[in-house]
A protein has these predicted regions:
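Inward-facing hydrophobic residues that define packing positions of alpha-helical scaffold repeats
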Residues: 31, 118, 169-173
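Extended ligand-binding clefts on enzyme/binding-domain cores
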Residues: 1-28, 40-41, 48-149
Length: 220
């Protein structure tokens, strides 16, 4: 396939099909940056060319095996593939995720396949998307059904093109801490007082970044 093989997802759950598309997208980005470092800092053209060769193979594999046709949403990215025609349609809250592809630098947020994928994964077609009385968003197979992850909410805001969507998510994040004043790993979409991990620094950091990008970046 040209892609890198994964045994486990960012959530630490085992892969079903072992070519994890978001991880390969992230690897492609890093290989491009590594090539730039090799040229500019190390003056090692051979190393740069090898990094770009591997990057090209990964991207070709993603395009060949990681994009599938959905009857409702059109061309979308699969979460996992095996290179033999099998694939898993889902997205997990943990990063790298399909939702995070523009944040990682793999593609622009207006990319049509990404927009199709985003519409799909932010719907109940995604088995890890949960809608409750208080919140809706992407969760994870790592936690119970119905639990939304603040990491995914923050990433939804960071990759949104709409200021109103960013503001709505910030209000949701700040309003679902159950009085802890910190982001949790996950919380129950019907009742945020039911949560996992009272303090999850990864989610804290992404929430802070979303607030900075939305309100402060242009003024500092």
């Amino acid at each position: 396939t040209g892609m890198t093989w994964s045994g486990f997802r960012p959530s630490d759950d085992a892969c079903e099909y072992h070519y994890l598309i978001p991880a390969n997208c992230f690897a492609a980005v890093i290989l491009g940056e590594l090539a730039a470092i090799a040229r500019e800092a190390w003056q090692d053209e051979a190393f740069a060319l090898e990094a770009l060769r591997v990057r090209r193979e990964i991207v070709q594999g993603i395009e060949a095996y990681g994009i599938v046709h959905h009857p409702r949403f059109g061309r979308i990215y699969a979460y996992e593939a095996d290179g033999l025609g099998h694939f898993r349609l889902m997205d997990d809250a943990n990063v790298p995720s399909l939702l995070s592809l523009p944040y990682l630098g793999y593609l622009p947020p207006e990319d049509p396949v990404y927009q199709n994928t985003r519409a799909w994964l932010l719907s109940e077609e995604n088995p890890c998307y949960f809608q409750g009385k208080v919140a809706c968003g992407v969760g994870s197979e790592h936690t119970a059904a119905g639990y939304v992850w603040p990491i995914a909410l923050a990433m939804q805001g960071l990759t949104a093109n709409c200021f109103e969507e960013k503001e709505r998510i910030i209000r949701l994040l700040l309003g679902t801490t159950a009085g802890c004043g910190r982001m949790h790993e996950s919380f129950y979409a019907d009742d945020p007082s039911q949560f996992t991990r009272p303090w999850f620094s990864w989610a804290d950091s992404l929430c802070a970044e979303l607030i900075y990008e939305t309100y402060l970046k242009e003024t500092l």
